[in-house]
Amino acid sequence: MSQLVDRRLSGKNRSAVNRQRFLRRFKAQIRKAAAQAVSGRKVADLERGEKISIPSKDLSEPIFHHGPGGRRNVILPGNREFVSGDRIDRPAGEGGGGSGGSPDGEGMDDFVFELSKEEFMDYFFEDLALPDMVKKQLAAVPEVKKSRAGFVSHGNPANLHVVRSMKQAIGRRLAMAAGPREALRQAEEALEALVAEGRGAEPDAEALREEIAALKARVAAVPFIDTWDLRYAHRVDQPVPSSQAVMFCLLDVSGSMDEDRKNIAKRFFMLLYLFLTKSYERIDVVFIRHHTVAKEVDEEEFFSSRESGGTVVSSALELMRDIILARYPTSNWNIYAAQASDGDNWDDDSPRCRDLLLQSILPLTQYFAYVEIEAEEPQSLWREYERVKAASPRFAMQRILALEDIYPVFRELFRKKAA
């Protein structure tokens, strides 16, 4: 019976299995820490690790032990200090008196460990997905395309590769005839030597002639091409991603959006952008900033540049509509949008925003999410968008009143739907 001994060095990941088991066990605590990360630090720093603190009581294993009551008259082995009848004080806990100890000084210190960037992001984006990430016409039959995958010895005659087959035949003939050809050469040289010596009529010469004839017959019997030589071009079905998506991010940077509100809006979109790049490889993200005039910008300018002015939200919606019609046909793209604003808008423009959504944008999109930031009272845009929400299931809206609301609102807007 054979035995395999794995002598490979585990390196720095020698405890990877135990670590994964530990992460699964304390999943609830880790998810709670991930939810607090948005309010505890900048969203731009989400792509790094995180320190997780777990209470010591959650680490303890259930055990059987003697209760605090009852009487025990026993002297344990190794005792040198006590005799029967002595009363022993309960030992103090291990909690330290420093800043990291337990509050009462009698418990155990919390256990703190570091999550890697990948582990933290996995927990952070758990249970999140773009809603309805599928096209109805593509759901039933996945799209595939043929791609080359070398050559095979069996296949459709229409896929016969002549050049590859002839190469195989030449190689086979050379291999099969190599031995007889060498023997034929040696026999012919021996016969020539006998003839040169005048012994061409001797029995040895006749035997060589018979051997030469047999060897020539063997060489001639090697087929020019055989079924073993045939090679066919092989093609396999490669799945083609049937769902490609584009996400529009619309940000209000008008004068009514103060720096605190802009900061919350930027954090929301940065969180959204991290989610998209984490979860989907084939997705476009279009950044649109607007005040009185809308402008498509790159990621850096979207988050960093500062402008001010009035508020005309319809300019951003019109630009989004034009970009969809120009670059993202609905037959090939799933279209999603998220808009962040304080809700302050020119009163005459809010009804136009409602009409643009209902008539031009929502018919082209799968989902449109709107977040209103730090608006104490519903603004005109919010009231018009409530009418949009009542008219279309593709539209969702939430309010963010504080920095701590970003993550819960984000999860509510983009949570997975139960199957």
Swiss-Prot record:
UniProt cross-references to InterPro entries, sorted A to Z: UPF0229, vWFA_dom_sf
One Pfam family it belongs to: DUF444
Source organism, top-level taxon: Bacteria
Biased composition (Gly residues): 93-104
Chain segments carrying region Disordered: 85-108
Family statement: Belongs to the UPF0229 family.
NCBIfam families given in the database record: PRK05325.1-2, PRK05325.1-3
Protein name per UniProt: UPF0229 protein Tbd_1233
Organism (species): Thiobacillus denitrificans (strain ATCC 25259 / T1)
